[in-house]
Curated annotation (Swiss-Prot):
Keywords: Endoplasmic reticulum, Glycoprotein, Isoprene biosynthesis, Membrane, NADP, Oxidoreductase, Transmembrane, Transmembrane helix. CDD domains: HMG-CoA_reductase_classI. PROSITE patterns: HMG_COA_REDUCTASE_1, HMG_COA_REDUCTASE_2, HMG_COA_REDUCTASE_3, HMG_COA_REDUCTASE_4. Residues 112-188 are annotated as: Linker. It comes from Capsicum annuum (Capsicum pepper). This is 3-hydroxy-3-methylglutaryl-coenzyme A reductase 2. The gene is HMGR2.
């Protein structure tokens, strides 16, 4: 069905007629008015329509069954077929009556519909042109925004004020009355769709599938939202984004996109290679501070980063009738003899998935199984979930009394601070270290080695312990992790466990130089899938040299990205701790992170 076709009510309301002039109606509607005087087949009995139909349907099949039975009996007894009893005669009459009714109700009406449609399928001249235009628009594959380039320019009605639908509010004075919401005029067909969505006739979520144009759907949805809420979305951009690229994988119900500035910190000298680290943030001074840390590391000979573990996790929960049965499955899963079988079942989910181990925990008659597997260059949540489902299906055959409560039961643990991630790790576990010379500490960081060591002990260790921190033994690791994650298309919500970090500082070389390290047990990153395929994020990954999958060594791009994240955190920790030690934190934030500019004017 063409959702953009204008309703009859809209057609009538779109024209202004003179006092003595009647609006033209489609002949189909006029025919319906004329047919009100005709007698239909359903008027055969003074009964409701469904009773009449049911009666004649029952009569038809009952009589047909009776006549067929009698016919078969006559053939079996060699009775002449033309010899008809009174009951058979009544059955024949009933059959003819039911056939006439059913043909009159269904067949003739169906034929009349096509005959009437062939003779009267026309509107008045203006409406026919409008309908033809809409049908031509439906066959066009290009978006409306590109109409001028495709040679199908659409006439646009003059711009006008569109009054938003807002709740009735008490009257206010002229001085307090807000300015009316002004939006660009939509085309006539878009206007009809907007009205249908506002009225609830068309679901907003179905616009992409009905229109076949993601950008146009976002534009219409944005206008609908403005009219319903009465709030302007003028500052939310719509153009300049490929909405087709996010359909079905990144975002639903789109109305635009937000703009986050991206800065560059570096070069970061890590494992003998230089990296320019993209950081998407709205916090002033963050990129500048991280950049200063990179400068200090570079001047001191660079940093070293080591990958300790690489394994994404998923932990389903199953329930048995007794705790004994749950323990039996625990012993079965943890038995090394059975691991190879379970691994083969798990690894069938993907050519990159490789099961590493299964860690079990019992809570009464419930068993939580934490699956750990490598996932190549993908972050791997979907991959490991598919593998877990395969294993659960296999175990269901062996343990018929096993009840699967959920494929994810928080023993993973995803997007939550958890001791299991802090201790066992999740994703990539990385440690990064550097030795900062005394000269660099004084000239670049403007502080002393002893002051940094003391501050780290009292702030990152003692202070965090007093606060009951879980994985938060650092200054601001999440700042750097979030900024790099947004820039490179990672899942920002996984910043929670990815920012687990303990920062250590120690004076070395007779107290002259500073040894600094960050240990991050659960960095969850990928270079394929999710937001990594978006143009901006893909460009940032390309800048780091980790775009896409590594065909020669699967998984190496994601592991390299994890080490870069850890190296960036090291730079950020070094610079912020130095600023606090030197008493520069407040001054720098007042200079770079506090502005008196009118941002609304700048954006307009």
């Amino acid at each position: 069905m063409d959702v953009r076709r204008r309703s009859e009510e809209a057609v009538y309301s779109s024209k202004v007629f003179a006092a003595d002039e009647k609006p033209l109606k489609p002949h189909k509607q006029q025919q319906e008015e004329d047919n009100t005087l005709l007698i239909d087949a359903s008027d055969a009995l003074p009964l409701p329509l469904y009773f009449t139909n049911g009666l004649f349907f029952t009569m038809f099949f009952s009589v047909m069954y009776f006549l067929l039975s009698r016919w078969r009996e006559k053939i079996r007894n060699s009775t002449p077929l033309h010899v008809v009893t009174l009951s058979e005669l009544g059955a024949i009459v009933s059959l003819i009556a039911s056939v006439i009714y059913l043909l009159g109700f269904f067949g003739i009406g169906f034929v009349q519909t096509f005959v009437a449609r062939g003779n009267n399928d026309s509107w008045d001249e203006e409406d026919e042109n409008d309908e033809q235009f809409i049908l031509e628009e439906d066959s066009r594959r290009g978006p409306c925004a590109a109409a001028t380039t495709l040679g199908c320019a659409v006439p646009t009605p003059p711009a006008k004020h569109i009054a938003p639908i807002v709740p009735q509010q008490p009257a206010v004075s002229i001085a307090e009355k807000p300015a009316p919401l002004v939006t660009p005029a939509a085309s006539e067909e878009d206007e009809e769709i907007i009205k249908s969505v506002v009225q609830g006739k068309i679901p907003s979520y179905s616009l992409e599938s009905k229109l076949g144009d993601c950008k146009r759907a976002a534009s219409i949805r944005k206008e609908v939202l403005q009219r319903i809420t009465g709030k302007s979305l003028e500052g939310l951009p719509l153009d300049g984004f490929n909405y087709e690229s996010i359909l079905g994988q990144c975002c639903e119900m789109t109305i635009g996109y937000v703009q986050i500035p991206v800065g560059i910190a570096g070069p970061l000298l890590l494992n003998g290679r230089e990296y320019s680290v993209p950081m998407a943030t709205t916090e002033g001074c963050l990129v500048a501070s991280t950049n200063r840390g990179c400068k200090a590391i570079y001047a001191s000979g660079g940093a070293t980063s080591i990958l300790l573990r690489d394994g994404m996790t998923r932990a389903p929960c199953v329930r048995f009738g007794t705790a004994k049965r749950a323990a039996e499955l625990k012993f079965f899963v943890e038995d090394p003899i059975n691991f190879e079988t379970l691994a083969n079942v798990f690894n069938q989910s993907s050519r990159f998935a490789r099961l590493q181990r299964i860690q079990c925990a019992i809570a009464g008659k419930n068993l939580h199984m934490r699956f750990v597997c490598s996932t190549g260059d993908a972050m791997g949540m979907n991959m490991v979930s598919k593998g877990v489902q395969n294993v659960l299906d296999y175990l269901q055959n062996e343990y018929a009394d096993m009840d699967v409560i959920g494929i994810s039961a928080n023993f993973c643990s995803d997007k939550k601070p958890a001791a299991v991630n802090w201790i066992e790790g999740r994703g990539k576990s990385v440690v990064c270290e550097a030795i900062i010379t005394e000269e660099v500490v004084k000239k670049v960081l403007k502080t002393e080695v002893a002051a940094l060591v003391e501050l780290n002990m009292l702030k990152n260790l003692t202070g965090s312990a007093l606060a009951g921190a879980l994985g938060g033994f650092n200054a601001h690791a999440s700042n750097i992790v979030s900024a790099v994650y947004i820039a490179t298309g990672q899942d920002p919500a996984q910043n929670i466990e990815s920012s687990h970090c303990i920062t250590m500082m120690e004076a070395v070389n007779d107290g002259k130089d500073l040894h600094i390290s960050v240990t991050m047990p659960s960095i969850e990153v990928g270079t394929v899938g999710g937001g990594t395929q978006l143009a901006s994020q893909s460009a940032c990954l390309n800048l780091l040299g980790v775009k896409g999958a590594n065909r020669e060594a699967p998984g190496s791009n994601a592991r390299l990205l994890a080490t870069i994240v850890a190296g960036s955190v090291l730079a950020g920790e070094l610079s912020l701790m130095s600023a606090i030690s030197a008493g520069q934190l407040v001054n720098s934030h007042m200079k770079y992170n506090r502005s008196t500019k009118d941002v609304t004017k700048a954006s307009s």
